[in-house]
């Protein structure tokens, strides 16, 4: 690549790999095991360390820190990594930390995501594609976030929680439980408020199926009998609804967290 794309104050360690048309602004620091793929742009004062790869067309804004060691006491300098996909926008003061031995040794971020100012993505998180994290969203370790999920500003997610596809979490929500796909949650303590119907409509989901799925989750979380029985009954009743099937599959998976439920 042309040296004219690298500011004279940037510090790039020997061994770092830069693709075509990479742009590195003033006072950036790039470690020796970092890979920046084609068309990556670092605005200024960006620090990227560790075994870290940034996918093509990703833009990172000032004072972001990517690939630093995880914030856990038992970290023993294991060679864990951070992998970030393509076409991501990573705004000012975002932190994405490397994986750990207890979580597969990797933190992974997909493609086409927007992380607004001050977002923190903890060790061993697995983030999908097309997600939006508003300002100062904080994810603890080992969290999975499905495609198209939206998390409102200043929300915090407890370690090991799962955030389902197409779900939406309102701002200022502490989330200590799994959020089902398409779920809409918010509160001082995150509770299920229904489905993310507006977001589902924008993504082209069938309106009739979406409304039917809303009725289905009300039966699951508020109906008669025990929870497992209700899941089975709803699965049989709505077996032609692909949205309900996706939610049922999520509910039937093993998890170390409870589910966000309707407020009593």
Curated annotation (Swiss-Prot):
For biological process, the GO terms are: lipid A biosynthetic process
Q: What is its main location?
A: cytoplasm
**Which InterPro entries did the record assign?**
Acetyltransf_C (IPR029098), Acetyltransf_C_sf (IPR037157), Hexapep (IPR001451), Hexapep_transf_CS (IPR018357), Lipid_A_LpxA (IPR010137), Trimer_LpxA-like_sf (IPR011004)
Q: Which domain of life is it from?
A: Bacteria
Q: Matching SUPFAM superfamilies, A to Z?
A: Trimeric LpxA-like enzymes (SSF51161)
Q: Which GO molecular-function terms appear in the entry?
A: acyl-[acyl-carrier-protein]-UDP-N-acetylglucosamine O-acyltransferase activity
Reaction(s) the record says it catalyses: a (3R)-hydroxyacyl-[ACP] + UDP-N-acetyl-alpha-D-glucosamine = a UDP-3-O-[(3R)-3-hydroxyacyl]-N-acetyl-alpha-D-glucosamine + holo-[ACP]
Asked if the keyword Acyltransferase belongs to this entry, the reply reads yes
Gene3D superfamilies recorded? Hexapeptide repeat proteins (2.160.10.10), Udp N-acetylglucosamine O-acyltransferase, C-terminal domain (1.20.1180.10)
List cellular component terms (GO): cytoplasm; membrane
Q: Which UniProt keywords apply?
A: Acyltransferase, Cytoplasm, Lipid A biosynthesis, Lipid biosynthesis, Lipid metabolism, Repeat, Transferase
At the top of the EC hierarchy, this enzyme's class is transferase
HAMAP family for this protein: LpxA
Which family does the similarity line name?
Belongs to the transferase hexapeptide repeat family. LpxA subfamily.
Tell me the protein's name.
Acyl-[acyl-carrier-protein]--UDP-N-acetylglucosamine O-acyltransferase
User: Can you name the source organism?
Assistant: Rickettsia rickettsii (strain Sheila Smith)
| Gene for this chain | lpxA
């Amino acid at each position: 690549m042309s040296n004219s794309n690298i500011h004279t104050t940037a510090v790039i360690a020997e061994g770092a790999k830069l693709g075509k048309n990479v742009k590195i602004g003033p006072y950036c620091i790039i470690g020796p095991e970092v890979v920046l793929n084609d068309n990556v742009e670092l605005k200024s004062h960006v620090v990227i360390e560790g075994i870290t790869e940034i996918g093509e067309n990703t833009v990172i804004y000032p004072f972001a820190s990517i690939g630093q060691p995880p914030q856990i006491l038992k970290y023993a300098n294991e060679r864990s990594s951070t992998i970030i996909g393509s076409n991501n926008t990573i705004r000012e003061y975002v932190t994405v930390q490397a994986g750990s031995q207890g979580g597969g040794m990797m933190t992974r971020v997909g493609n086409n995501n927007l992380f607004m100012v001050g977002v923190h993505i903890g060790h061993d998180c697995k983030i999908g594609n097309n997600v939006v994290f508003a300002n100062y969203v904080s994810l603890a370790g080992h969290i999975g976030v499905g495609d198209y999920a939206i998390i409102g500003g200043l929300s915090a997610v407890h370690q090991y929680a799962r955030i389902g596809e197409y779900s939406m979490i309102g701002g200022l929500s502490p989330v200590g439980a799994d959020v089902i796909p398409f779920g809409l949650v918010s509160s001082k303590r995150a509770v299920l408020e229904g489905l993310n119907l507006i977001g589902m409509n924008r993504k082209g989901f069938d309106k009739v199926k979406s409304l039917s799925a809303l009725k289905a989750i009300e039966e699951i979380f508020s109906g008669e009998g025990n929870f497992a029985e209700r899941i089975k009954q709803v699965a049989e009743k709505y077996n032609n609804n692909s949205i309900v099937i996706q939610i049922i599959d999520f509910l039937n998976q093993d998890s170390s967290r409870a589910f966000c439920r309707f407020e009593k």
